[in-house]
């Protein structure tokens, strides 16, 4: 068998991004054959990805890419906050955002089949799972085209993209507003009907407990609903930099119109797994006793 040299390990690592020890093991198993060792690692990394695929990914990053009148916002998830700061993970997310803007995939499946360099997005994702040891998923994305665009990222956990006409500074302020106040829609008319119905139901229950006449109760309910609509629609919110005016008034003063926006918050709506360390240890002890 050929001697396994440091240069061979380094060459295999450069090709596969696998950890050094994994590269050495693969070369040993392949008896020094680089091509065979690369194939062994591809299989191993794929197996790691398969094992990791069932694990919850509630951490991650939001990335934005804007080029002229085309842009994209994407959320890519991982398992831990630590990995969300990994350079390879961040580079992958930024490449994905750029690819979405340039290629206009219909959905995550179509995106996964596109290429980053010589590999598909899915192949790169699988390789990174094997290298880093955590599950990673492309959760969602939104693409914009044919309009002025601006984006705002609050760190890597909150991202907003705004389609607008007019002044970019004002549009950027609107994006920052969305990141800070997290509206669910652009205008009150756009608030999803199910959210309005839920808020109305809560308001009706509270108003009914007041014991006031029906006509007063009806006004109380309507007042509560209108207040809610103003709180959750971007244009109707008090502007965070000057609460004496609404976002809509701020934009109008700058001759700017926001046509649409997308807001992503990392892990929003994903139920995180709560680890019970004591229960985990107890289970391991019980399993060990059964094997004894």
UniProtKB/Swiss-Prot annotation:
Localization terms from the record: Cytoplasm
Underlying gene: tsf
Keyword match Hydrolase: no
A single cellular component GO annotation: cytoplasm
UniProt record similarity statement: Belongs to the EF-Ts family.
Keywords: Cytoplasm, Elongation factor, Protein biosynthesis
Function: Associates with the EF-Tu.GDP complex and induces the exchange of GDP to GTP. It remains bound to the aminoacyl-tRNA.EF-Tu.GTP complex up to the GTP hydrolysis stage on the ribosome.
Annotated spans, Involved in Mg(2+) ion dislocation from EF-Tu: 80-83
Coarse class of the protein's main subcellular location: cytoplasm
Protein name: Elongation factor Ts
Alphabetized CDD domains for the sequence: UBA_EF-Ts
Any one GO molecular function term: translation elongation factor activity
């Amino acid at each position: 068998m050929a001697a396994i040299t440091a240069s061979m390990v380094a060459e295999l690592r450069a090709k596969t991004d696998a950890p050094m020890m994994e590269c050495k093991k693969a070369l040993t198993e392949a008896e020094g054959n680089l091509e065979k060792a690369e194939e062994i690692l591809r299989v191993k990394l794929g197996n790691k990805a398969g094992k990791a695929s069932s694990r919850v990914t509630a951490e991650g990053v939001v990335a934005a890419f804007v080029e002229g009148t085309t842009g994209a916002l994407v959320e890519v998830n991982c398992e831990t906050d630590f990995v969300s700061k990994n350079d390879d993970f961040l580079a992958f997310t930024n490449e994905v955002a750029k690819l979405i803007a340039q290629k206009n995939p219909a959905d995550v499946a179509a995106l996964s089949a596109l290429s980053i360099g010589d590999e598909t997005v899915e192949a790169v994702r699988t390789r990174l799972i094997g290298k880093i040891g955590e599950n990673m998923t492309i959760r969602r994305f939104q693409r914009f085209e044919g309009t002025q665009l601006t984006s705002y990222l609050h760190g890597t956990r909150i991202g907003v993209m705004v389609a607008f006409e007019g002044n970019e500074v004002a549009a950027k302020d609107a994006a920052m507003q969305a990141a800070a106040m997290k509206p669910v829609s652009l205008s009150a008319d756009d608030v999803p009907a199910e959210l309005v119905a839920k808020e109305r139901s809560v308001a009706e229950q509270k108003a009914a407990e007041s014991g006031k006449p029906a006509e007063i109760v009806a006004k109380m309910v309507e007042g509560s609903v209108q207040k809610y609509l103003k709180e959750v629609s971007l244009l109707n919110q008090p502007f965070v930099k000057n609460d004496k005016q609404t976002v809509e008034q701020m934009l109008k003063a700058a001759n700017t119109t926001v046509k649409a926006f997308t807001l992503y918050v990392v892990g929003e709506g994903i139920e995180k797994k709560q680890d019970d360390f004591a229960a985990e240890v107890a289970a391991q002890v019980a399993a060990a006793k059964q094997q004894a």
